[in-house]
Amino acid sequence: MEFELSFDPVEHNSNEFRSGQLGSLVDVYTPGNFPNLSEADVVVFSITENRGLNSDEKLKFEAIRNELYSLYQGENRIRIADLGTLKLGASPSDTYQLLADVLQECNDRGLFALFVGGSQDCTVGQYKSFVQSNQFCNMVAIDSRFDLGLDQQNLNANSYLSHIINLQPNVLFNYSNLAYQSYLVSRNEIEFLNKLFFDVHRLGSLRSNLEEVEPVLRDANFISLDLSAVKMSECPAVVDGSPNGLTSDEVCQLMRYSALGNKLQSFAIYNFNGDNDINNQSAKLIAQMIWCFFEGFFHKLRAVTANDENLVKYHVSMRDGEYNTCFFKNKQNDKWWMEIPILSDENQKFAPHFFVPC
């Protein structure tokens, strides 16, 4: 596909930034100048699709870009291309489809995609990129709610998850929620997700030991982050925020954990509402979140294989030898994985998910 036809350019002048600032290093799609994607590791872009929130408000992301590109690169440089703003479809469904096509093309080219939106129903576009490639996937949502919606509710930012679960063909291998708040979800929703053997992590339990969810993020194929998961006092530019939620440093730590996984293909930050921002506080936070992701991305772990010389292999026998499994420990960073034996040819399609981070 022609990337240039899927995006609108943005204004950017690299000469306005100091040496070492991201703005002097990133390759941005400006009028008449599309980035050379063969020289990029990561592509970033914005999505103005907002109809899933029943809003026609024109979203603007200049503040986020200005704050991000004013930050200095970390110890290691990541090659970044800014594709500008994804074009709006005639309907939200058209936008989802265009997003799915773009993300599938990014994956085919070996490019990681990070973008800021827009309403969270665009998560459907992230998921559809895996449906189109017939690839089973693990989804992680960092969100104060589950967004299951009501029975037969139209697809929007508050009901997108039920539509993903019901979408055919179904390639959702696992779903995990991080940072839900108990008073914002019903017991029926929790029981429903438990029946599907999905993983949900309450804000309080997550906060007591943030590192425990690192394996969950390391196992994700795509991640959808709702800014309402962050405390409204620390991120005021949100839709339907809460006085409770993740702190700025906690969400930045989750961003870094997310970047370490070798399966991850896209990361999206949703439900940004710049009109609610105060002194660019939210724009600054989002910029620093993305910076933390870039730092983690440089240390991205390579795919795990049973013959990897950097791994120590531990054989474990269970039920008096009835079952055997293996644990793998990376010698360099002490990360662990568990290998689930593939017992039949039918399960070969799930092979990428049989090394489980732990």
Regions found by a protein language model. Give the residues of each.
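Conserved alpha-helical scaffold segments that buttress catalytic/binding sites
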Residues: 2-269, 273-358
